[in-house]
């Protein structure tokens, strides 16, 4: 019984599926590397790596709580712990609060500016899952939530927030909207039946075009970022890899096959990794 419950909690926090953690981690590392112009302070690095894991898990818990009444009607999610009855709603809320509190305790070791920013981060993580009931742009709110670690990390490293931070914030928000639209394309048919909204539904037959446009703007802004910091060739080679991966994702999406759209979404891990490696080598 205990083992079953532990496994259910593990699944509820998506510890068994680290893709979301990685997609949140890469831009956080971009911010830390650029702010530190190389290797960030060790304590800041540890706090943000742990914070990414904990807050992504908290986000998954509150997302499943928000979707508990509809997940049972979606092919991909009907076996999740809440709709299957392995975890109660009360247990999910308690778990979310525990993860959020532990994350906040970590943030308390940082400077006051970072602590203040963390309240907005928790708010974004909490409201995002409910947006899909009210707007076709929940991916925008995910973009904001997944990008908020960027100003937090920069503030923790430097105790300031120059305008370039918000430029990086927008880069990641656009990239997040692109890959979460790919993710939404997987569930589009089910979402239409149960009244859940998404950019995949909003974009309709222009979904692939819009994802491509978002990817193109993301790349263009990354190039502008490199020019701003006068980064070396390694960074641009990394962007060439990222651009090639975007082209590959478009190939996967061409027939809007559910499984292949999901593969396109997963492929974004390598995009984030390429940019991170490029930045690290360049600044190192």
UniProtKB/Swiss-Prot annotation:
GO terms for biological process: ubiquinone biosynthetic process. Pathway: Cofactor biosynthesis; ubiquinone biosynthesis. Signal peptide: none annotated. GO terms for cellular component: plasma membrane. It catalyses: all-trans-octaprenyl diphosphate + 4-hydroxybenzoate = 4-hydroxy-3-(all-trans-octaprenyl)benzoate + diphosphate. The chain crosses the membrane at residues 19-39, 42-62, 93-113, 114-134, 136-156, 161-181, 209-229, 235-252, 264-284. The keyword Lipid biosynthesis does not apply. Its main location: membrane. It holds the Pfam family UbiA. Catalyzes the prenylation of para-hydroxybenzoate (PHB) with an all-trans polyprenyl group. Mediates the second step in the final reaction sequence of ubiquinone-8 (UQ-8) biosynthesis, which is the condensation of the polyisoprenoid side chain with PHB, generating the first membrane-bound Q intermediate 3-octaprenyl-4-hydroxybenzoate. This is 4-hydroxybenzoate octaprenyltransferase. The gene is ubiA.
